[in-house]
Amino acid sequence: MNANKNKGKSFERFVAKHLSSVFNLNFERIPNSGAYVGGKNVSRASKLTEEQLLLCDGDIIVPKELSHICFECKWYKEFSWQKLFKNKGESHLNKWIEQTEVTTKRMWFIIFRINRQGEFVCFSSDYNVTFPGSYFECKINDKFYSIASLDNFFESNIGYMLRICS
């Protein structure tokens, strides 16, 4: 197995452990995650039940209490932050958002780590979340997205996320 796949899997495990700790619920990395219903395989989703989709949508298996939420995980060496100040956005982020919006109908969060820069969370600016610190809003293809530090983000939004899923 190549180093990049191992790096991605370890970050997915990190995110699952972090979310489990925050929500006091069980989150697990999806075994063999990697676009089972995403990308070229998006047509598979129409054949699956809601329960089956929970097991293969995103990179993290969510507990039933948060079944309306999808988590994608990414770990990259570099990220061109300066490109976010242009309406075109950053190529990695653009691709992640496009893939996520095509493959899931649920509320989604893209959690990503950039080497030597930290962990961040990206999501639609339409969500009514609380920001525990500063955040950045960018416009990509005429839609607005927010990016915030992962630090205390989900801790600050436990109630909101559980409410929208009930």
Model-derived segments and spans:
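Acidic-basic catalytic patches of nuclease active cores, encompassing PD-(D/E)XK
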Residues: 1-47
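Well-ordered, non-membrane alpha-helical segments in soluble/globular domains
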Residues: 89-100
